[in-house]
From Swiss-Prot:
Coiled coil: none annotated. Its EC number is 2.1.1.166. This is Ribosomal RNA large subunit methyltransferase E. One of its GO terms (molecular function) is rRNA (uridine-2'-O-)-methyltransferase activity. Keywords: Cytoplasm, Methyltransferase, rRNA processing, S-adenosyl-L-methionine, Transferase. It comes from the Archaea.
Length: 258
């Protein structure tokens, strides 16, 4: 075992939330992030209908189930197969949340439009700041777009974002679709992590504007004829050319801002 591996193992052994999650049979330490976010912002209530985007390995599904109880309902979507949870009101679908057929499958399972959309998904981390920031923005904008398609009016939204040059622009974009937008970092997030959570409270019912002048929307790959959005990061495949293009866009926006 190398030094990095030993350091990682030691870090996990000393990680309060990792040990707590293991003790209480939660699949991820991230479970406690959702508990803390909900405690602060009152996003999810008992009996709510919830959709979890990028739900693997299932930690947020477990947290949401603990909050909504047996009379709520939760559907998760992820590219990976998620091991079933022992609850009749929690279902995980394998698929791409940007695909209409997957969204239809989720909608068909739901008893009504969701009260809350949650997303703790992360793109593949390259270690290159601009690339990771761009991938994160692409993924979180996909989540926002999906939320505007599914949420009931007045519903809530929470998504993980990596900090960077365009972080505030993303928060501004969220505020266009919700009455209030907040940012926070729960106690369970590691101090060294660049992750921040963006909260949208009370969906105003607006449809996502793919022609928006927002610099965040311009980062997306679009089909100009059909206006369909593709998500290389969501498929966990992104070429060097795609990465370079996103970095170029971010640098151009950065220079304009300066």
């Amino acid at each position: 075992m190398g030094k990095k591996d030993k350091r990682w193992v030691l870090q996990r052994k000393n990680d309060h939330y990792y040990n707590l999650a293991k003790k209480r049979n939660y699949r991820s330490r991230a479970t406690y992030k959702l508990f803390q976010l909900n405690e602060k912002f009152n996003l999810i209530k008992e009996r709510n209908v919830v959709v979890d985007l990028g739900c693997a390995p299932g930690g947020w599904l477990q947290a949401a189930r603990d909050i909504v109880g047996e009379k709520g309902f939760i559907v998760g979507i992820d590219l990976q197969t998620v091991k079933p949870l022992p609850y009749e009101n929690v279902i995980a679908i394998k698929g791409d949340m940007t695909k209409e057929e997957i969204l239809k499958q989720a909608k068909d399972l739901l008893p009504e439009k969701p009260d809350v959309i949650i997303c703790d998904a992360s793109p593949n981390i390259s270690g290159v700041w601009d690339v990771d920031h761009a991938r994160s923005l692409e993924l979180t904008t996909m989540a926002l777009m999906t939320a505007t398609k599914m949420l009931k009016k007045g519903g809530n939204f929470v998504v993980k974002v990596f900090q960077g040059d365009l972080f505030e622009k993303y928060v501004q974009l969220v505020s266009e679709y919700f009455d209030k937008a907040f940012t926070t970092k729960p106690r369970a997030s590691r101090d060294e992590s660049a992750e921040v959570y963006v909260i949208g409270k009370r969906f105003n019912g607006r449809k996502f504007d793919i022609n928006s002048k927002s610099p965040i929307v311009k980062l997306l790959d679009t089909n100009p004829e059909e206006k369909e959005i593709t998500s290389p990061s969501l498929r966990k495949e992104i070429s060097k050319e795609d990465s370079g293009l996103m970095i170029k866009r971010i640098k151009e926006m950065r220079s304009k801002k300066e």
